[in-house]
Regions:
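Periplasmic c-type cytochrome electron-transfer domains
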Residues: 1-206
């Protein structure tokens, strides 16, 4: 989380720090504003404060009956597993036993992610390579709180959950291979419409 905080400051806010001391050259994609830039370097104390803030944020609580009713949500939860979504969007992980904060040790975390990188194919690729991740590799997005979001996928390209699900399907091209999720999306598309809606209701309840 500390590195995440530091990188977000550097990349999203343009604020260098001890972990990321150099500005990124964003010239090719920028529209320059006439106002001058501020030279801001954030201290380790600021980064630690941001890290602690995120570490102790309470998770969003799922709805038991909204939308669609409890029975629909329960059916959707079961379908989420049977079609294969849960293979990557793992419902529950456990926090580490060793931590500076015992209150956070060995806790069930219902984030719906395996926190792993997966090849998603050219359809979702942003061509941004970072570390060992290629331009079509993405960490599985946690789904807790997805019911409160207005836009979906890494670039917010859609406000429709069904479109977001189907965007996981992508054939390979000369640059990237096919999406790892193709079989799962085929399973989803094969569901009766009522079961598809149950799955959407379950996601909206998170």
């Amino acid at each position: 989380l500390q590195l995440f905080s530091a990188e977000a400051l550097a990349v999203e806010q343009g604020q260098t720090n001890m972990f990321f001391p150099n500005d990124s050259d964003e010239t090719p994609g920028c529209h320059f504003a006439p106002t001058p830039n501020l030279n801001v370097t954030r201290s380790i104390d600021f980064i630690e404060s941001a890290t602690l803030f995120m570490k102790f944020l309470a998770p969003s609580l799922p709805h038991a009956t909204v939308p669609g009713g409890a029975d629909s949500i329960a059916r959707g939860r079961a379908t989420f597993g049977t079609v294969g979504c849960a293979a990557c969007h793992t419902p529950t992980l456990r926090s580490r036993a060793e931590t500076d904060f015992p209150v956070l040790a060995n806790k069930a975390v219902n984030l719906y992610s395996d926190l792993a990188l997966h090849n998603m194919g050219p359809g979702l690729a942003d061509d941004i390579a970072q570390g060992l991740a290629t331009g079509d590799e993405f960490r599985t997005a946690p789904l807790w709180g997805v019911g409160t979001r207005a836009f979906f996928l890494h670039d917010g390209r859609t406000n429709n959950l069904i479109e977001a699900i189907r965007a996981h399907r992508s054939a390979g091209n000369g640059t990237y291979g096919p999406s790892e999720a193709n079989a799962v999306i085929a399973n989803y598309d094969a569901l009766p419409v009522a079961q598809q809606q149950d799955l959407i209701n379950f996601l909206r309840s998170l």
